Amino acid sequence: TPIPLMTGTDFEGISRVIEKQTGIPVFYFPTSGMHTYVKGAGMAMETIARELVPAGRKSVKERKNKQENPLKINILGATPLDFSINSTLDSIKEFLSRHFEIISTFAMGSSIEDIQRAGEADINLVISSVGVLAAKALEERFHTPYVIGTPIIGFENVLAEKLIESAWTKKSQTAYFSVLQKAHKKDTANFTTIQNAEAVSNLKKIRSLTETIEKNKVSGNVYIIGESVISQSLKAALALRYRIEATVICPLETEPEYTEKDVLLFSSEEDIKKAITDADTVIADPIYKTICSEKVNFVAMPHEAYSGRIYRKEVCDFIH
């Protein structure tokens, strides 16, 4: 709510009083009600990274045998708004555990004790825009590099390679940039078709991304509307796995560091409606279907930050 800010509430003073009386660390965030969840949740994760993670870590270059000592990783940017309460985050963890030792997840499914170990990680994976500020804070404090990208089937193995590369070079990067640059040059000959080893039968009733894309016959002039990191990772996955090019429209806050130049940044439905007049296929939360032409092949990708819990049962598992 913007009311405390409008009335000049002394957040810092209140925090000091409560902390003194209880002995519990207290933090405040200057929310104004004028931004999206990306900014608010991002500030919260950054504060956790700065205030709750003690100093002390061992450099990856001190490891004698990287096979006997798997690289340690934090997953940053996990919230129910972006990853719902379905199998996606569990699938991401299961995939990463094949290559890395997962220290903590900011901020679903990890205890305070897990998060306090975040400084031990060799590499941080930012799976949504919400985790970028925390990644920068951990890089500043512990010199831990980070990679931006969401593990999505067709793109997940490329992302794993980028994580290992950054852990050893100590250079942060946005994983989908190299994939999308090749796609722009029409140079798809060197793209690797990713084969996922997990059987679809294991999904039970969970809706898989593979099933969603193939069943809806995604083709033609494709637009993806959604959160910046997830949408661009999906764009990379479509290019790698299906040779499909897509245009991303992001209605949320985003930064040039992890946003391609051709991403369309629109906050109003009117602007988005104008941008997709030539669309053959639109991949987005179901609330956007009302602004699409009846001729458009609309592929529903529910996102709780947009439509809440209405379409939760239809949320896809990104790894399958």
Describe the role of every protein-language-model region.
Residues T1-H320:
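An N-terminal assembly and electron-transfer interface module characteristic of large anaerobic redox
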